[in-house]
């Protein structure tokens, strides 16, 4: 039998050995196709001069592939039941450390400084993310300013479509903007549901996020910028005016003045949020921020 973890036979053997039962609440689906693992590490551009943070190693299938190609790997695992399994399956790799904990509550920057022997090496984040925590984890990693050159995630295809979307498409929304503001997003390849154990209900995709040197647009207040983008998509079929007036009631008595000012910078409030690109949202939020401060 192959020693690689990512095969149906080896995965079944490991699970039986430890009497492991999947927890639906943790969205556990383990990869059983080593070709997919190779494609993930190729997409992430992992080399021996790269440190890697992995989130959710499971029984270690992707971790094993990362250990073979990276300098060091630090893996966050929330499920304590998996720790003895990982000790076993990864025992041959001295360049892997497993941290028991929830990455959403962790000080990842501190972990990087303390756990890697050479923290100065380029850092990449790689993960097979369960659907229920995909967005919170990605946004935490972005907003905590983790010094990662890139992030490569396997996630539900629908979410990958939203992250990599372009304006005027049904997948484009506030999540697209929240991520593409900081990162270039590429949907690398589709992963069929048949390569997981247990098999999920939907296909997955691998998305590669590469950090921009500067955010995609200049904004006066990032927090307000994201507040405006979220408000603009609150009800997708409504116009910018309807959504923004609902979020910021102080705009209502000054509609004519607002319309005139936004028309002057090329933004029509009868448009829907999905038609604006990120630089246009930056112009909109910068104008609105100043407008709302006026007496």
From Swiss-Prot:
Annotated function: Specifically dimethylates two adjacent adenosines (A1518 and A1519) in the loop of a conserved hairpin near the 3'-end of 16S rRNA in the 30S particle. May play a critical role in biogenesis of 30S subunits.
GO CC annotation, single: cytosol
Catalytic activity of the protein: adenosine(1518)/adenosine(1519) in 16S rRNA + 4 S-adenosyl-L-methionine = N(6)-dimethyladenosine(1518)/N(6)-dimethyladenosine(1519) in 16S rRNA + 4 S-adenosyl-L-homocysteine + 4 H(+)
Cellular localization per UniProt: Cytoplasm
UniProt keyword Magnesium present: no
Family, similarity comment: Belongs to the class I-like SAM-binding methyltransferase superfamily. rRNA adenine N(6)-methyltransferase family. RsmA subfamily.
Top EC group: transferase
Binding residues for S-adenosyl-L-methionine: 29, 31, 56, 77, 102, 128
rRNA processing in keyword set: yes
PANTHER family per UniProt: DIMETHYLADENOSINE TRANSFERASE (PTHR11727), DIMETHYLADENOSINE TRANSFERASE-RELATED (PTHR11727:SF7)
Record keywords, A-Z: Cytoplasm, Methyltransferase, RNA-binding, rRNA processing, S-adenosyl-L-methionine, Transferase
Family matches, as PROSITE patterns: RRNA_A_DIMETH, SAM_RNA_A_N6_MT
SMART domains named among the record's database cross-references: rADc
E.C. no: 2.1.1.182
Gene Ontology MF terms in the entry: 16S rRNA (adenine(1518)-N(6)/adenine(1519)-N(6))-dimethyltransferase activity; RNA binding
Protein name from the UniProt record: Ribosomal RNA small subunit methyltransferase A
């Amino acid at each position: 039998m192959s020693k690689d973890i990512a095969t149906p036979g080896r995965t079944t053997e490991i699970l039986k050995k430890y009497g492991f039962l999947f927890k639906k609440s943790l969205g556990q689906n383990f990869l059983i196709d080593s070709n997919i693992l190779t494609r993930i590490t190729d997409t992430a551009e992992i080399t021996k001069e790269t440190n890697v943070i992995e989130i959710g190693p499971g029984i270690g299938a992707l971790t094993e592939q990362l250990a073979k190609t990276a300098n060091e790997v630090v893996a966050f695992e929330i499920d304590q039941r998996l720790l003895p399994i990982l000790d076993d399956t990864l025992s041959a790799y001295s360049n892997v450390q497993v941290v028991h904990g929830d990455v959403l509550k962790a000080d990842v920057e501190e972990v990087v400084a303390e756990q890697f022997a050479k923290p100065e090496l380029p850092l990449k984040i790689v993960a097979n993310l369960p659907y229920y925590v995909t967005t919170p984890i990605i946004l935490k990693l972005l907003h905590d300013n983790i010094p990662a050159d890139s992030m490569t995630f396997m996630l539900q295809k629908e979410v990958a479509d939203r992250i990599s979307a372009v304006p005027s498409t049904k997948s484009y929304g506030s999540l697209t903007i929240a991520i593409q503001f900081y990162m270039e997003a590429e949907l690398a390849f589709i992963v069929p549901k048949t390569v997981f154990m247990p098999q999920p209900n939907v296909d997955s995709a691998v998305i590669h996020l590469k950090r921009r040197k500067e955010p995609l647009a200049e904004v006066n207040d990032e927090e307000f910028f994201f507040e405006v983008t979220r408000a603009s998509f609150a009800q997708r079929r409504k116009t910018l005016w309807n959504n923004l007036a609902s979020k910021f009631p102080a705009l209502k008595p000054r509609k004519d003045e607002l319309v005139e000012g936004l028309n002057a910078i090329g933004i029509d409030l009868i448009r829907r949020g999905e038609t604006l690109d990120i630089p246009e949202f930056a112009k909109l939020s910068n104008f609105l921020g100043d407008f709302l401060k006026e007496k």
